[in-house]
Every structure is written in structure tokens, then in C-alpha cells.
């Protein structure tokens, strides 16, 4: 009761001393319950030297951490002794609990609304003073950032398209934009710093990912690289690109058929070891589910829900690619994808904070006037507008560029 009353006074920005504490306890008819005015006065006699308050607080924090480690040890021991638990599951429990302790986070349960809104107002005020249009991690594309203000922490972002639209290329181009330094060694505008990205590639090998990034970053055609038909200029461009890529904090895991639990454990470990700002998955439908599941829909639901959980636990945006059903091909006239086309489960739409489709008309219409043009269709955004915008796509180097609506625009 005494501490709760002191906390109330602090939340009301009122002074905390013996007089105000006694007065507030009297108003609540709790003064006698806590020992009376004499006990409150005696508490002041036991106050240690305030000059060492930081050291005292550190001791309390350290003891709290040790107690939590003891509790964690008991929890892991019980899980290990419980027959139904698989070793990998026990390891995941241990890592998850240890991560929370290391990050200083605990499961607080219910939080009163006034504390939530006060924190909201502080965040809004900070954004107002910062005066930035991008409050999350930049996408590398101006119009995308205008719609989203960047990728936000704890968001599950789904990038979906039919085959050959450039899903993997678009995802990796975003990684390149935020993680690879410029020739001068700094971040690319509008990024304020270089970010670290963890990529789970279930479709392509890490070597294939590396070749694509070399082509995209150097501007040297994929075909020329694979055929070994490189000029002296090509070699120079590739060498420069390789130097920049070597400085990027992009980590690729190409384990096939990974499940959510293993992905979470690897991402958590990477964040603890080197830091992690974003996770990317290529792609959702290739992930595995442990145990028996009644239907494919339930499998996908379990995966999408798990990916959202990873984003929340690690407090970062998670970008996942997703396949679409064949419905766009079956529609006559307009083949642009819709939310109903998300393959095998409506839960992807429900779990995602943002769903964006990639559409290139030239894939369906060879005579289109929009050759080399891609549309990014933001079909769902939980905390922002929906709409679409255009990008330029160069298939020879699998790279997307900002779209400039001038007839003589050529990507650099």
C-alpha cells in the first residue's frame, strides 16, 4: 500500500515526502493499516546515503536478474524432465527466457490505459520534435516510404506476387538499400545509419542470393556473370560492389524447410550476438510445421501467426514473401492481384500489418506500353493508407528503381 501510494503520487507529478504520503494514505483510510504515522516517520530514519542511490539501484537490478535466472533454471529443468517436450523445444524455452532477461523485458500482464496513453503521447511528442517523415526503417523507395513512413517495429509485412514478378529481387533490393554502404562508406539516403538484416532464404541458396546481389549492386548483367563473359569494366564494377557487400551486415540462412520455432531461435541468437534490425523470409509457403496439422490452411495459419509472434518478440519488422493463387491468371482483363488471392489461407491477411503486391503487366501482356514498369499495390495497411505506385524494374540485373515519370528516364 505504501509503495502503491507513492507510485500514484509520482504518476500525478506530486512531491513524495512524509507529509504528502501520510496525507494520501489518510485520504485512502489506509494509514493505520500500514502502521500509522509513526511507522511512516521511522522509514525516513532508515534511508541510506542518497549519494549512492545509483549503486543501490544497480544492486537491486542485479539481484532481480539473478532471481529471474534461478526461476528460468527451474523452468527449463521441469521442461526437460517432462517427457512430451522435444529437446529443441526445451532449448527454445531456455533461449527465449534468457533473451527476455538479457533484454530486460518481463511479462507484465495488464497495464492500465493511462500509462499506455502517456507513453503514446511521449512517443508522438518525440516524433513531432524530430520532424521526420520516416519513423521506421526506410524501404529504399520514396513512394513506399510516403505510404508507410518506413517499416515499423513489431510489424509483419507481406510482399506477395505471382512467379516471375520479382518478389525475391524486391526484398533483397530493400536489404541492399538499408544495409550496404555507399562508395563513401556511409548509409544511403534517407537512412540515418546502416541496418543489420537477417535473411532466411528457403527457395534460393546463399550462393544464388550472393550472385544476385553482386549483379544488382554492380549493374553487371546476371547473364554475363553466369556465362563468364566479363569485360575489364565489368570486373572493376564487380570488385567495387564486392567490397561494399563485404561491409554490409546482411546474414543469410538457407536452411530448407525451416519451421517458425527454429527461425525464432536463430533470429534471437543473431540479435543477441551481432544485433538485428530486420528479418526477411523467402518465402512463407516453404516453411515447415512440426506435428500433425489437419489441413494446409491450418499450416499456413500457424506459420503466419508464428511470424507475427517473432516480430513482436524481437521488436523488429519482419518481411515475408508469399505466393499467390492462380486466380489473377484466371481473371479476364485485369490481372492485378487482390487480397483474396493470398494463397491457401485468409489468416495471412489477418496476421499481416501490411500487405503489398508486386505486379508487372509485361508478364501477361507482351505488347504493353509499360515495359520495365512494376506496380506496388498496398492492399492492406493496419496503421496507414492503401494505394499503389510505380517502380522501374531492370530484369537483367534484377533491380527495382524509383520511378521518374519522364520519357528519357534511365536507371543508373
Regions flagged by a language model, labelled:
Residues 1-64:
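Noncatalytic partner-interaction/assembly domains of nucleic-acid and motor enzyme complexes
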Residues 167:
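Conserved lysine of the Walker
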Residues 146, 177, 181-275, 289, ...:
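Cytosolic-facing regulatory segments adjacent to core modules
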Amino acid at each position: 500500500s505504501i509503495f502503491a501510494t507513492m507510485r500514484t503520487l509520482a504518476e500525478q507529478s506530486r512531491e513524495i515526502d512524509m507529509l504528502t504520503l501520510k496525507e494520501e494514505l489518510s485520504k485512502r483510510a489506509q494509514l493505520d493499516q500500514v502502521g500509522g504515522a509513526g511507522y511512516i516517520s521511522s522509514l525516513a530514519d532508515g534511508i541510506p546515503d542518497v549519494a549512492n542511490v545509483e549503486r543501490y539501484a544497480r544492486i537491486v537490478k542485479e539481484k532481480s536478474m539473478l532471481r529471474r535466472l534461478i526461476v528460468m533454471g527451474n523452468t527449463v529443468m521441469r521442461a526437460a524432465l517432462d517427457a512430451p517436450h522435444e529437446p529443441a523445444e526445451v532449448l527454445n524455452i531456455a533461449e527465449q527466457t534468457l533473451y527476455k532477461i538479457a533484454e530486460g523485458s518481463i511479462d507484465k500482464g495488464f497495464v492500465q490505459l493511462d500509462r499506455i496513453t502517456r507513453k503514446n503521447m511521449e512517443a508522438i511528442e518525440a516524433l513531432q520534435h524530430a520532424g521526420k517523415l520516416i519513423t521506421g526503417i526506410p524501404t529504399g523507395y520514396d513512394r513506399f516510404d510516403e505510404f508507410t513512413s518506413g517499416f515499423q517495429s513489431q510489424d509483419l509485412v507481406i510482399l506477395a506476387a505471382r512467379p516471375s514478378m520479382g518478389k525475391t529481387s524486391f526484398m533483397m533490393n530493400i536489404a541492399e538499400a538499408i544495409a550496404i554502404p555507399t562508395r563513401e562508406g556511409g548509409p544511403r539516403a534517407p537512412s540515418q545509419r546502416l541496418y543489420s538484416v537477417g535473411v532466411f532464404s528457403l527457395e534460393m541458396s546463399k550462393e544464388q542470393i550472393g550472385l544476385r546481389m553482386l549483379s544488382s549492386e554492380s549493374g553487371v548483367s546476371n547473364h554475363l556473370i553466369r556465362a563468364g563473359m566479363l569485360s575489364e569494366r565489368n570486373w572493376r564494377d564487380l570488385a567495387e560492389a564486392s567490397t561494399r557487400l563485404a561491409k554490409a551486415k546482411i546474414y543469410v540462412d538457407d536452411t530448407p524447410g525451416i519451421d517458425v520455432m527454429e527461425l525464432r531461435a536463430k533470429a534471437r541468437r543473431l540479435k543477441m550476438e551481432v544485433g538485428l534490425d530486420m528479418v526477411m523470409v523467402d518465402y512463407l509457403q516453404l516453411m515447415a510445421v512440426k506435428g500433425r496439422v489437419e489441413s494446409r490452411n491450418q499450416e499456413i495459419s500457424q506459420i503466419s501467426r508464428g511470424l507475427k509472434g517473432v516480430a513482436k518478440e524481437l521488436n523488429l519488422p519482419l518481411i515475408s514473401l508469399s505466393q499467390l493463387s492462380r486466380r489473377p491468371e484466371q481473371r479476364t482483363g485485369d490481372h492485378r492481384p487482390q487480397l483474396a488471392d493470398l494463397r491457401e489461407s485468409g489468416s495471412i491477411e489477418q496476421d499481416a500489418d501490411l500487405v503489398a503486391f508486386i505486379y508487372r503487366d509485361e508478364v501477361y501482356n507482351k505488347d504493353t506500353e509499360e515495359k520495365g514498369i512494376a506496380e506496388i499495390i498496398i492492399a492492406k495497411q493496419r496503421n496507414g493508407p492503401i494505394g499503389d505506385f510505380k517502380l522501374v524494374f531492370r530484369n537483367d540485373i534484377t533491380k527495382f528503381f524509383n520511378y521518374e515519370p519522364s520519357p528519357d528516364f534511365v536507371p543508373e
